[in-house]
Amino acid sequence: LHVRSRRQRQMCIRDSKMQGAAISSWGVGTNLITSKDCPSFGGVYKLAAIQNADGEFQPKIKISENIEKITNPGNKTIYRIYDKETGMLRADLICFADETFNTGEDLLLFDPNATWKKTLLPGGTYTMRELLVPIFQHGECKYESPSVKEIAEFCRQEKETLWDETKRLFNPHKVYVDLSQKLYDTKTKLLNEAHH
């Protein structure tokens, strides 16, 4: 048994493995708990919609000078899109919760911050899986927790759908997260209304 400890970081571990180090256990400790490269969590809850008395959601938006901090309005869900032939991840698509898609039809994906960057997925060449799963509805738990073994197997299967380029520790390729046309149009409309 070979153990390496004392403030190990992912780059050091990667380099040691690439160099053929015969280490069977890593003592990561502090660097497992607190990322040295990104010590703060950037996720913050923001108001996206207000539900009226009729149960309809009125989209709301938070505007910022920083384009990445402008929120996506409305009651949303997200779909993971896979290549039908290879099973590999193509992109994630954020859309309104009431939007539906037909995988037999062409799907145009575009970068919401650079809309000229487009990818057309021909109908029949992709599959979609909704990522958001209801946990509570009307105060009742609707979710059956999987076992640890089931969670581990699910994670293994999902990891297999990632391209090697996205799993690199240094300079990884991004997994695309796009907006549906309907969500993009609503966001643009709210931004334009706010500046008039």
Place the predicted regions along the sequence by residue.
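Single conserved hydrophobic/aromatic residue that forms the stacking wall/gate
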Residues: 1-13
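Gly/Ser/Thr/Ala-enriched C-terminal appendages of enzymes
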Residues: 14-196
